[in-house]
Design a protein with these regions (language model features):
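Short, surface-exposed acidic
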Residues: 101-118, 143-159
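Short, amphipathic alpha-helical "recognition" segments used to contact nucleic acids or chromatin
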Residues: 118-127
């Protein structure tokens, strides 16, 4: 950040509207990402407190609440799930109720906090195609080490999630089929058009019949 300070004391960076792998979150470039400045101190210093607004201005820090799973549910047409969330139910509890994991009247976070940890990991990990090994790692990271699963438990969670969420799995298939079709003609740059009209480009697309891979930055 210090290296990016201009003579007028401003700091600038680029904004990528679909920069993060897998989730498509906004991101920055060149090692500076204003969309993900650490909340906690790093080596005794708060990065956020290093930023100050100009004279007569205020700085606002805003966050989109659980935007990825909300958009995923919209894109795949899971409006029953979105209906639960719109009704004021915690998103991870809504997942538990929609998939039959939780049926109690009391809020999940009060009655079954361990189950909420699992639902959070399922929503944020399995919703984006995690396999068993990766899901075990993601679940542990997302819950601060509170959720540790055996390989067998991870495999079961992956299988159950995909069986319980066929609309999400179908969306994955549609996206992959579109890229595969594009790559038949232009494997060096396959393009997917979002609902917003913005393109997402994948470079050097390879399909070995089992796995589809590509790069979001040319030459990587």
């Amino acid at each position: 950040m210090i290296l990016r300070v201009r003579p007028d004391h401003r700091v600038s960076t680029r904004l990528k509207y679909c920069g993060a792998p897998h989730t498509g979150r906004w991101s920055g470039a060149g090692g500076l990402n204003f969309q993900g400045i650490p909340r906690d101190e790093v080596e005794g210093t708060s990065a956020k407190k290093c930023l100050t607004p100009g004279k007569g201005r205020v700085m606002v820090s805003a966050d989109l609440s659980q935007i990825e799973p909300r958009v995923l549910a919209y894109l795949c047409g899971d409006f029953d799930f979105l209906g639960l969330v719109r009704g004021g139910i915690d998103l991870y509890e809504a997942h538990g109720r929609a998939t039959g994991l939780y049926t109690e009247d009391e809020p999940m976070k009060d009655l079954a906090p361990e189950l909420r940890h699992l639902c959070k990991a399922r929503v944020l990990g399995l919703g984006y195609g995690c396999g068993p090994k990766k899901f075990g790692e993601v679940a542990q990271a997302l819950t601060g080490g509170k959720l540790n699963m055996t390989d067998a438990e991870s495999r079961k969670q992956v299988k159950d999630f995909r069986n319980q969420n066929p609309k999400i799995v179908e969306l994955w298939k549609k996206c992959e089929d579109n890229i595969r079709e594009e790559a038949k003609h232009t494997p060096e740059c396959a393009t997917m058009i979002c609902k917003s009209g913005k393109p997402i480009r994948y470079f050097d697309v390879k399909d070995d019949g089992r796995e589809l891979t590509g790069q979001k930055v040319r030459g990587q």
